[in-house]
Amino acid sequence: MAQRDEPFAVFVFGMRLNSVRGLPRWLWGLRVLRAVEADLRAHPERGFLAGRVYRTGRTLVAVQYWASFETLDAWARDHALPHRPSWQRYLREALADPSVGLWHETYLAAPGTWEGVYMNMPPWGLGAGADLIEMQATKGSARARLREQRKRSSRPPETP
């Protein structure tokens, strides 16, 4: 079971190939995404906890876990980091050609408002970036586990 007694942020984003003429830009985006994730993993001090990229058909989806919204926001705004020039290039090109779509969602999670349960799994999802604890048989329901999380931390969720 994943345990994190501090609020954190979940950043979900993706890229969709809307037209075959956008394939070169979509493939370029995939290369950029891999490079950005490698850079984030090399610099955990930036607040990146864990993440994974998925491909389904013509859509890429990335799920990232961050130490806080502030660390995610600071990373996104830092012009010196590798993702920034790629993002600016994408914005310029997207105005001229909608063949590749981009989207993102940001969620803030406070202790007691989420759970991650992993059985017979390698580190996965938030469990790859949080402390893992053995689930106790006496706390077998989500309700009991979430109640326990809320007891450990009385801080409200952080807001941007």
Question: Where are the regions a protein language model picked out?
Answer:
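A short, glycine/Asx- and small/polar-enriched loop/turn
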Residues: 58-60
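Tryptophan-centric aromatic hotspots in well-structured domains and transmembrane helices
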Residues: 65-67
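Short S/T/G/P-rich N-terminal loop/turn motif that feeds into the first structured element of a domain
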Residues: 1-56, 74, 98-160
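An amphipathic, aromatic/His-enriched active-site/gating alpha helix that lines ligand/cofactor pockets
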Residues: 69-101
